[in-house]
Structures are given as structure tokens and as C-alpha cells.
Swiss-Prot record:
Pathway in which the depicted protein is active: Lipid metabolism; C21-steroid hormone metabolism; Steroid metabolism; cholesterol metabolism
Transit peptide (first-last residue): 1-39
Pfam families in the cross-refs: p450
EC assignment: 1.14.15.6
Places the protein is found: Mitochondrion inner membrane
Name of the protein: Cholesterol side-chain cleavage enzyme, mitochondrial
Residues reported in the UniProt entry to bind heme: C462
Function in brief: A cytochrome P450 monooxygenase that catalyzes the side-chain hydroxylation and cleavage of cholesterol to pregnenolone, the precursor of most steroid hormones. Catalyzes three sequential oxidation reactions of cholesterol, namely the hydroxylation at C22 followed with the hydroxylation at C20 to yield 20R,22R-hydroxycholesterol that is further cleaved between C20 and C22 to yield the C21-steroid pregnenolone and 4-methylpentanal. Mechanistically, uses molecular oxygen inserting one oxygen atom into a substrate and reducing the second into a water molecule.
GO molecular function: cholesterol monooxygenase (side-chain-cleaving) activity; heme binding; iron ion binding
One Gene Ontology term, aspect cellular component: mitochondrial inner membrane
Key words of the record: Cholesterol metabolism, Heme, Iron, Lipid metabolism, Membrane, Metal-binding, Mitochondrion, Mitochondrion inner membrane, Monooxygenase, Oxidoreductase, Steroid metabolism, Steroidogenesis, Sterol metabolism, Transit peptide
Length: 521
């Protein structure tokens, strides 16, 4: 169930913008060879103002953007602009000016120049909320030394291989419970299969997974009767994303000062997220002080952070809140897209299942070993993120002047990598509309160089990357072992932007039980 008054997550919401003549999601070849300007040139760089642009009037540009494309199709706006301007352009929307790039060679130059404390674009309504209500912030919104201090401490508990191996049994338990949910539905249906939209189930699965990893405790989101407090948190996360979109290109303080419905609708879920996350964290802390460490097994990320003393309790709470809020819609959306692509490409699904079953037999059921034996499955997650990235761009503010495509880009300029457009550009991916995980297994580095960008790059890549990769891989292992996934309509469902990229309309899957014994006879 969604919060009252909210549109479904997978339905396009046009808001107050008029959506006219949306371009198709297929990208044509760039007109200029990508080797020109990507490397070092002996010519003097051209000035910033000569970079191709629709014009310097940000408010007029914003008006045309709203009228001709619409906020919820910003990914296609990038596609159109690259078709018009080729590998680089600059655009001012409202009061935010950016340079956009698509070529992996330019992406490499950008990220290799980012410095030790990279800064990215901060979502304006999120910053405004934290500043006005004086909420503590974590690594998502921190900068410079404060960001570095928290990130180093968190990396040890969230990214380090010796730590992430502890996540395996926690994530596997949740995945097996999800499989049980589908088996019960198949049995209840009485038709030998189950058909339906499982997007809400995937959100609950993702919330159950991230809370189990952080707190070492289950929240009951996959039970017959769903935990209502957990569901309220999930709904608040979606509403937070949804209500952010309309304030991306206009000063959020305008919405706040005039007490608009848009601002109120954004504040309400943020308050829920903070209150619930604080409650989870403080209850865990209180129980730990009361009971002490009576367990010798791994008890989750929060337990380790509390015992480390490298971060204050307020900083821990802020970062736990961000991990909870960032670990639901993002992971669940990628899993939905992955199931969608597998259902449309049954030969690929059969290849993935064969790899998983062989890995299970060879590893004799040990999940850590299984994970080492499924390179194609891991490549399929990369392929899903190529076609369906969660973010529409990756952003960096330049530390120093940088020459890209023969143009001098001044320090402090916001440069954005349009990863949706990049993933579908035939100049950089052969047959880009085809779901082909094997492309990522090539030993030719030119095929994959700075193209796997679903989680970002460098020291400021997604903090939850290792959790998400393990969570998705283990989920898919369990699903492939138990079900054959099909879809009735093979046509493209389309993509819409609600701060993250998601299906434009609900996807209905059909799950058939998979008989492993029959395949071994």
C-alpha cells in the first residue's frame, strides 16, 4: 500500500509541467568521432562560452524544458541534446549551469581529476530541509574534511571485504523468505503460477535487507501481516523522492516561504524518515547498553559503528538515516528492471540459471563460494544498470581548470556525466538496445573502459555499493533457482524520472516454479 494520496511508484507523474512530444528512448550515433578532443591537444583550448549551448538565459531554458520535454523525461532531454550538440554541451536551467559529457574518455579525465574530497551536486530541497530544520547530515550532504572523516569510518564497516562477508547470511535469509512469499502465492493461486506487479514486495524486501544488515534484526516486512511502521517508512522514502523533483530547478526556499503544498508534501515524509530512523537507532543503542554484548556473532553495521568510537552518536544517526533512506527504492528498482530484462530475454535467463545451478553444486551450497562462481550473473547486474541506471547523471564540481573536448572548463564548474544517454549510445556500446551481459566479460578493456558507472566512481562512489551488489546477486541466485520469470507484454514499458529512474507503468510478471530435479534427470 502506498501512502494516501500518492500515485503508484511505477506510474508517470507529470505534476505541473506539460509533457509534449516525448522523444523515443533510442539514441542515434554521435555525429562527431569521439577521438576528437577527448585526449591531449596541442591547440590552445577554446573558451568556456563557446561550448555548444541552447542559450544563457536559464529561466527561458527552463520554460522550454518544462514545455517541450517535462521534468519526468529529463533523461530523454539529455539524449536529444547530445544528438544536437554531440559529445559536450552546456546548459543553464534556472540558476544552475552544467557542462554535460557522454564520452568515456571525457568521463575518465573528469574523475581522474576529482581530488581527494570530491563534491557533487546536492539536491536543493534536501539541503534546504536540513538547514531550515537543523537536521544533522551524513556523507550524502557533507563536504571536504567533514565528509572525509565520516566516509573513512563508514568504508571500514560498509565497503571493506573483510566486513562485507558478514552480510551474506543476513541477506540470504531475507532472499529465501522472499522466495517463500512467492511460493505461497503460487499455491494460493491454484493455477501453477502467480502473476502480478511485485514492485511493493520488492520495496519491502529491500527495506528488510538493509535493516537486517544495519541492525542485525528483522522487521517483519515479508510476513503475512506487514509491519505498519516499516511500511510507513517505505512510503515516506518514495514520497521524499517524488516531491523533490519539482524543486530541483527552482529555489526551494521560495516553496517554503510561501508555504506551498509542494514544500509541505516534501517536509512530511522527511519528518517521518528522521523520526523512524532515530527511533530504530536509539532503541538499538538503548538495548545494547542494557544487555551488553552477549552475542559472539556479527550483529550488524550499527553495532560496529557504536563500538568503534570514531564517530559521534549524532553522526552515526545521521549516516544510518541516509543508508536506510538510500537502500530501498534504489535497490528494489534495479531488481525490478533486472527481472523485466530476464523475462524479455528468456535465453539469457536460461544461461544465468545454468550458471547459478552449476555454482551451487560446485560450492556445495556455500554462498561465499557461489558468489565467486557467477561472473555472468554479476555482469547481468552491470548490464541492467547500463540500460536502467538509478541516477540520470553523475556529477562533480571541478577542483581545477580542466580541458574537455578542447574547451577550457573553469574550476568550480558543475560537470555532469549523462549515464542514461551513455548507456544507450551505439558509439560506445554495440547494439545498445540488446540486453547482453556477456559484453561485460570481454577482456578488451576498450569495451568496458569507464562505462560501468551504475554506482558512480572513485572515493565518492555509492556508499552502499557492496551491500547492494551482494543483496541483488543473492536475491537473483535464489530467484533463478526457484522460478522461471515471464512477462506478457514484451514492448518497452518506458522510463520516468522521479529523482531516480523508474518504470513508466506497472510491470506484471508471471512466476513459474522451477523444478531443479527435473533438469538433473
Amino acid at each position: 500500500m502506498l501512502a494516501k494520496g500518492l500515485p503508484p511508484r511505477s506510474v508517470l507523474v507529470k505534476g505541473c509541467q506539460t509533457f509534449l512530444s516525448a522523444p523515443k528512448e533510442r539514441l542515434g550515433h554521435l555525429r562527431v568521432p569521439t577521438s576528437e578532443g577527448a585526449g591531449i591537444s596541442t591547440r590552445s583550448p577554446r573558451p568556456f562560452n563557446e561550448i555548444p549551448s541552447p542559450g544563457d538565459n536559464g529561466w527561458l531554458n527552463l520554460y522550454h524544458f518544462w514545455r517541450e520535454t517535462g521534468t519526468h523525461k529529463v533523461h530523454l532531454h539529455h539524449v536529444q541534446n547530445f544528438q544536437k550538440y554531440d559529445p559536450i554541451y552546456r546548459e543553464k536551467l534556472g540558476n544552475v549551469e552544467s557542462v554535460y559529457v557522454i564520452d568515456p574518455e571525457d568521463v575518465a579525465l573528469l574523475f581522474k581529476s576529482e581530488g581527494p574530497n570530491p563534491e557533487r551536486f546536492l539536491i536543493p530541497p534536501w539541503v534546504a530541509y536540513h538547514q531550515y530544520y537543523q537536521r544533522p547530515i551524513g556523507v550524502l550532504l557533507k563536504k571536504s574534511a567533514a565528509w572525509k572523516k565520516d566516509r573513512v569510518a563508514l568504508n571500514q564497516e560498509v565497503m571493506a571485504p573483510e566486513t562485507t562477508k558478514n552480510f551474506l547470511p543476513l541477506l540470504d535469509a531475507v532472499s529465501r523468505d522472499f522466495v517463500s512469499v512467492l511460493h505461497r502465492r503460487i499455491k494460493k493461486a491454484g493455477s501453477g503460477n502467480f502473476s502480478g506487479d511485485i514492485s511493493d514486495d520488492l520495496f519491502r524486501f529491500a527495506f528488510e535487507s538493509i535493516t537486517n544488515v544495519i541492525f542485525g534484526e528483522r522487521q517483519g516486512m515479508l510476513e503475512e501481516v506487514v509491519n505498519p511502521e516499516g511500511q510507513r517508512f517505505i512510503d515516506a522514502i518514495y514520497q521524499m523522492f517524488h516531491t523533490s523533483v519539482h524543486m530541483l530547478n527552482l529555489p526551494p526556499d521560495l516553496f517554503r516561504l510561501f508555504r506551498t503544498k509542494t514544500w509541505k508534501d516534501h517536509v512530511a515524509p522527511r519528518d517521518v524518515i528522521f523520526s523512524k530512523a532515530d527511533m530504530y537507532t536509539e532503541n538499538f543503542h538503548w538495548e545494547l547498553r542494557q544487555k551488553g554484548n552477549v552475542h559472539h556473532d556479527y550483529r550488524g553495521i550499527l553495532y560496529r559503528l557504536l563500538g568503534d568510537s570514531k564517530m559521534s552518536f549524532e553522526d552515526i544517526k545521521a549516516n544510518v538515516t541516509e543508508m536506510l533512506a538510500g537502500g530501498v527504492d534504489t535497490t528494489s528498482m534495479t531488481l525490478q528492471w533486472h527481472l523485466y530484462e530476464m523475462a524479455r530475454n528468456l535465453k539469457v535467463q536460461d544461461m544465468l540459471r545454468a550458471e547459478v545451478l552449476a555454482a551451487r553444486r560446485q560450492a556445495q551450497g556455500d554462498m561465499a563460494t557461489i558468489l565467486q562462481l557467477v561472473p555472468l550473473l554479476k555482469a547481468s547486474i552491470k548490464e541492467t544498470l547500463r540500460l536502467h541506471p538509478i541516477s540520470v547523471t553523475l556529477q562533480r564540481y571541478l577542483v581545477n581548470d580542466l580541458v574537455l573536448r578542447g574547451y577550457m572548463i573553469p574550476a568550480k564548474t558543475l560537470v555532469q556525466v549523462a549515464i542514461y544517454a551513455l548507456g544507450r549510445e551505439p558509439t560506445f556500446f554495440f547494439d545498445p538496445e540488446n540486453f547482453d551481459p556477456t559484453r561485460w566479460l570481454s577482456k578488451d578493456k576498450n569495451i568496458t573502459y569507464f562505462r560501468n558507472l551504475g554506482f558512480g566512481w572513485g572515493v565518492r562512489q555509492c556508499l552502499g555499493r557492496r551491500i547492494a551488489e551482494l543483496e541483488m546477486t543473492i536475491f537473483l541466485i535464489n530467484m533463478l533457482e526457484n522460478f522461471r520469470v515471464e512477462i506478457q507484454h514484451l514492448s518497452d514499458v518506458g522510463t520516468t524520472f522521479n529523482l531516480i529512474l523508474m518504470p513508466e507503468k506497472p510491470i506484471s510478471f508471471t512466476f513459474w516454479p522451477f523444478n531443479q530435479e527435473a533438469t538433473q534427470e
